[in-house]
């Protein structure tokens, strides 16, 4: 019948066999070799003899009989002795619960387990009860309800546990609460691994401080510091609050609320206690009630009406009292150690790097707890040759060759284990304690039983009547497990067994059960029935072998009935390490074997790896055999060559003999071939008429078809020739058409080019005429503008010349007046009778009095407004730079007194004199272009002159005075030139001249230019 997929489910036992329980979290399943058990035992554990005691059930007796058996040289099923590969003790609790132990195998199936080899770890075998119907499955194979599975997992609720423990502690009487605090405080002085005389004398843990906890000196120092703060700085209310904070620390430690991601539990608990103390404080109550009454929020009547609703604990009539010294000391110690632990935890978190996120949750408590036991065994120094490992196996010194190396890191591992243990909540610690006690009890019980006898064999099971079929392990190899089974057709199941044999099984040799390894259906398991054993004389009815296993791995073998898919039993077995040197080199064993079964996928992978290793080994052996065969063949060939050489090198007689034998053999073969050919010829001569007629018919058909083929070929050839002629004519027509098209295209291209040249020539000629006309018009406009500009410049230059002529005439008039004044001054000085000696006034320093100076002599003889040749000129303007006032009044520009500073030395220059002349060599350079016809092109103002590039025109007065000219000689020429007066845009100012005179009888002057000379240059 088809096997159900329920057999492939995992049958792992999620038990905390490591000494500590998980804090409400589900342990991650190790699909591949999960090393959660610390150090493991390999191969054979010990060579010493051990014993086993088997408790057999009996429905007729109330006590369990004890059957001593031997396992020094265990007997195989075929009767030959075989040395055991490891000590295997098999205590079997047939009607109860059996715990795993070291190097032992338990089969809980109302039967007896016999072990003869291999290391069989502690399995959890169970017997399934018979169902009412044959097709009813066992509860283990039935589908598991998720809600039922979730209800079996203990949830981790550290906040709820911490708050519940805190509420419980706050409700305890003072005496009981003091006792609880004392017990909690005493835990800090005990080593985590337990106190013993050996540990105290060897390691001094009480003084050095156990791993993960501070030392005794640190504790005393912190307690003293906190006690000093308690007595000096804390008042009564703060002391009572700190006392309740000690309760909070106890609750957080026991409830596990201060570790992991539950940091908010501390704040919540402290907040609850703080709010409770604030509400119960009499000072705060008086302050709040007084504030409410003063602000008229509530009235005294309302307060008295609702005050009875508050509990009596909150209505204080007197202030709090200080706690007793004993409770104060305990609270100080608890709070000091809490602060120290927080500081150490924060420092360790900052110092250690963050572990990588692997995505798998590992039972760290289990691993740490198991390692602690091993470390304690290392450090205890007790004179024992072995100790109990974390997974219940006896760990011997042979399994720890590097024990001294790991002993150096024992303190570090113990610190980690103690840190994990300190973070366990109270209920987890209780569960861990219970598991440890139960395991130690079962271990001691198993050791007491094995001390009374030897393991039993299959011969000891003869004559025993069992209620149901029994399966036991007979031999364990590195890659195979051999087992045997009893009869599965019991008396109470005769009807079902008969039905299976008749219908489901079909024959007596049909397998009554199948094997699943680690939850996976194992196809390489072979089961065969034992026929030679007489009925009633032996319990062995079935024998089987599970192959394809990996060495040094743990497996969980499930035996399931074929008819009902019920589990007969579940056995946990660990295969020993291989002893073959070649296989060890080819197969890579895990670095640390696991005693827990792997997942089905991992099991199959390991089996595949083992099979591949064996295949590679066989291939290597085959290659080695091939090489050996090649060597043998080469050796044989050498011998054959040697024999041939000896044969050829023999005498003539031998050669003749060999030749005659060869000829005889050839003659015989030729005769046989000749006889065979004669028989064939005889058969061919007698041809039947029917076959001859068929042959003639077929030949006629062939000739007819051949004629049709020839005619078809001729028709095909004629058709091909006709088509070829048509194709050739069409090709010639096509070639001629292509040539005509090419000629037409070339002609079209030539005509298009001519057309484009004509169009471009026409367009180019029209554009050239327009361009020339535009250029001519532009040149005419530029010439007109240039002519107008020159005309304006000539007119402006003429106006400037006229202005210069007028200015020169005015300057000559001023020079005449100055000369007359100087002459009069000299005459006056000569007529003055003043002292001329050096002791008196110096020459030229005798001031003239205004009364002595004749006014008529100082006035200008020229009229204020005169006319020359019909031209009217404006009166002389005084220079704006002249500072001395006129001697005759405001209308005169001459100096007022000849005694003062001579005014002719300070004559200001005209702005036209400062500017450079338009007639010099620099006149051709202009900032403004002639083509720029602005609004002021005819008027050359101050912007037309660049005074920065021309030296100012300075008039030399001495030259003017020394010049002997006739009046009107040059001026008349300049005035009679026919130029009309033009208003000048330049503003004229007083000119500045230079003169020189002496205190002699007269003076002389000279001028640097004349109007005639300037005019001549202009013309």
UniProtKB/Swiss-Prot annotation:
Residue runs in coiled coils: 602-788
PROSITE patterns linked to this entry: PTS_HPR_SER
Top-rank taxon, per record: Eukaryota
Transmembrane segments: 163-183, 216-236, 259-279
Places the protein is found: Membrane
Gene Ontology CC: membrane
Annotated Polar residues bias: 68-83, 102-117, 131-142
Bilayer disposition of the protein: Multi-pass membrane protein
Residues covered by region (Disordered): 1-142, 343-372, 580-603, 831-859, 879-905, 963-1019
Keywords associated with the record: Coiled coil, Membrane, Transmembrane, Transmembrane helix, Ubl conjugation pathway
Composition bias, Gly residues: 992-1008
Keyword Transmembrane in annotation: yes
Signal peptide span: none
Compositional bias annotation for Low complexity: 33-63
Function: Component of the regulatory network controlling carbon source utilization through ubiquitination and deubiquitination involving creA, creB, creC, creD and acrB. Involved in resistance to acriflavine, and required for normal growth on a range of sole carbon sources, including fructose, cellobiose, raffinose, and starch, and reduced utilization of amino acids, including GABA and beta-alanine, as sole carbon and nitrogen sources.
Family: Belongs to the acrB family.
Protein name, per record: Probable ubiquitination network signaling protein acrB
Species in which this protein is naturally found: Neosartorya fischeri (strain ATCC 1020 / DSM 3700 / CBS 544.65 / FGSC A1164 / JCM 1740 / NRRL 181 / WB 181)
Biological classification of the source: Eukaryota, Fungi, Dikarya, Ascomycota, Pezizomycotina
Gene: acrB
């Amino acid at each position: 019948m088809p096997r159900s997929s329920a057999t492939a489910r995992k049958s792992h036992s999620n038990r905390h066999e490591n000494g500590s329980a998980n804090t409400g979290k589900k342990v991650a399943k190790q699909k591949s070799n999960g090393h959660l058990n610390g150090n493991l035992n390999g191969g054979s554990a010990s060579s010493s003899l051990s014993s086993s005691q088997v408790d057999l059930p009996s429905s007729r007796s109330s006590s369990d009989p004890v059957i001593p058996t031997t396992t020094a040289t265990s007997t195989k099923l075929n009767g030959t002795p075989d040395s055991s590969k490891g000590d295997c003790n098999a205590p079997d609790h047939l009607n109860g619960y059996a715990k795993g132990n070291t190097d032992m195998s338990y089969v809980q199936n109302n039967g007896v387990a016999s072990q003869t080899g291999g290391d069989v770890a502690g399995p959890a075998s169970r017997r399934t009860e018979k169902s009412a119907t044959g097709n009813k499955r066992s509860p283990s194979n039935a589908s598991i309800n998720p809600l039922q599975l979730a209800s079996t997992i203990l949830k981790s609720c550290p906040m709820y546990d911490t708050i519940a423990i805190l509420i419980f502690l706050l409700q305890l009487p003072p005496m009981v609460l003091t006792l609880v605090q004392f017990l909690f405080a005493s835990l800090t002085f005990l080593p985590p691994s337990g106190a013993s005389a050996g540990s105290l004398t060897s390691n001094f843990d009480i003084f050095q401080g156990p791993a993960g906890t501070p030392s005794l000196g640190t504790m005393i120092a912190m307690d003293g510091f906190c006690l000093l703060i308690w007595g000096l700085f804390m008042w009564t209310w703060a002391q009572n609050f700190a006392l309740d904070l000690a309760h909070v620390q106890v609750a957080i430690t026991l409830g596990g609320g201060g570790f992991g991601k539950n940091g908010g539990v501390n704040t919540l608990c402290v907040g609850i206690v703080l709010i409770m103390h604030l509400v119960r404080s009499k000072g705060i109550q008086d302050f709040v009630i007084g504030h409410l009454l003063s602000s008229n929020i509530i009235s005294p009547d309302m307060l008295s009406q609702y005050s009875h609703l508050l509990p009596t604990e909150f209505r204080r009539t007197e202030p709090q009292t200080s706690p007793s010294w004993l409770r104060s000391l305990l609270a100080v110690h608890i709070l000091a150690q809490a602060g120290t632990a927080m500081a150490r935890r924060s420092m360790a978190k900052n110092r250690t790097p963050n572990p990588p996120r692997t995505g798998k949750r590992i039972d760290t408590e289990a691993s740490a707890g198991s390692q602690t036991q091993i470390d304690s065994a290392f450090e205890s120094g007790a004179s024992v040759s072995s100790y109990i490992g974390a997974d219940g196996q006896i760990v011997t010194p042979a399994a720890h060759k590097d024990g001294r190396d790991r002993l150096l890191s024992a303190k570090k591992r113990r610190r980690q284990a103690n840190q994990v243990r300190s973070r366990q909540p109270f209920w987890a610690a209780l569960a861990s304690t219970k598991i440890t006690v139960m395991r130690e009890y079962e271990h001691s019980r198993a050791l007491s039983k094995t001390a009374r006898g030897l393991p039993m064999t299959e011969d000891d099971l003869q004559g025993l009547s069992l209620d149901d079929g029994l399966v036991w392990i007979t031999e364990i190899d590195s890659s195979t497990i051999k087992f045997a089974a009893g009869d599965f057709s019991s008396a109470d199941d005769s009807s079902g067994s008969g039905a299976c044999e008749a219908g489901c099984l079909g024959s007596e040799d049909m397998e009554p059960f199948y094997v699943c390894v680690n939850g996976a259906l194992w196809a390489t398991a072979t089961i065969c029935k034992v026929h030679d054993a007489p009925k009633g004389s032996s319990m062995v009815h079935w024998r089987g072998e599970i192959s394809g296993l990996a060495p040094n791995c743990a497996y969980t073998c499930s035996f399931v009935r074929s008819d009902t898919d019920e589990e007969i039993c579940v056995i946990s077995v660990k295969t020993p390490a291989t002893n073959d040197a070649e296989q060890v080199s080819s197969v890579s064993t895990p670095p640390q074997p696991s005693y827990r079964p792997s997942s089905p996928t991992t099991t199959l992978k390991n089996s595949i790896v083992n099979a591949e290793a064996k295949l590679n080994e066989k291939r290597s052996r085959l290659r080695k055999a091939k090489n050996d065969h090649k060597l043998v063949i080469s050796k044989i060939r050498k011998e054959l060559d040697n024999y041939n050489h000896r044969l050829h090198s023999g005498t003539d007689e031998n050669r003749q003999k060999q030749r005659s034998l060869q000829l005889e053999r050839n003659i015989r073969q030729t005769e046989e071939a000749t006889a065979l050919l004669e028989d064939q010829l005889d058969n061919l001569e007698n041809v039947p008429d029917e076959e001859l007629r068929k042959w003639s018919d077929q030949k006629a058909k062939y000739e007819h078809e051949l004629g049709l083929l020839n005619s078809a070929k001729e028709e095909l050839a004629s058709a091909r020739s006709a088509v070829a002629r048509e194709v050739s004519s069409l090709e010639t027509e096509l070639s001629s058409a292509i040539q005509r098209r090419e000629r037409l295209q070339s002609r079209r291209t030539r005509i298009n080019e001519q057309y484009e040249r004509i169009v471009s020539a026409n367009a180019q000629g029209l554009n050239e005429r327009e361009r020339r006309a535009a250029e001519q018009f532009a040149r005419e406009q530029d010439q007109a503008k240039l002519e107008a500009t020159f005309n304006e410049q000539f007119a402006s230059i003429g106006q400037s010349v006229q202005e210069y002529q007028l200015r020169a005439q005015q300057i000559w008039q001023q020079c005449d007046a100055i000369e007359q004044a100087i002459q009069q001054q000299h005459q006056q000085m000569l007529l003055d009778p003043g002292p001329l000696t050096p002791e008196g006034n110096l020459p030229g320093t005798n001031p003239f009095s205004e009364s002595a100076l004749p006014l008529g002599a100082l006035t200008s003889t020229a009229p204020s407004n005169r006319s020359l040749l019909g031209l009217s000129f404006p009166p002389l303007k005084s220079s704006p730079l002249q500072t001395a006032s006129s001697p005759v009044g405001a209308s005169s520009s001459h100096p007022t007194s000849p005694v003062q500073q001579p005014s002719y030395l300070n004559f200001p220059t005209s702005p036209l004199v400062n500017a450079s002349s338009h007639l010099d060599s620099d006149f051709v350079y202009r900032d403004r272009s002639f083509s720029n016809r602005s609004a002021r092109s005819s008027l050359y103002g101050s912007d037309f002159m660049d005074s920065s590039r021309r030296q100012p025109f300075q008039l030399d007065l001495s030259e003017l005075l020394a010049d002997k000219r006739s009046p009107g000689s040059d001026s008349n020429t300049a005035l009679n030139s026919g130029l009309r007066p033009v208003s000048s845009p330049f503003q004229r100012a007083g000119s500045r001249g230079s003169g020189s005179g002496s205190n002699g009888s007269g003076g002389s002057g000279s001028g640097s230019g004349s109007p005639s000379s300037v005019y001549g240059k202009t013309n």
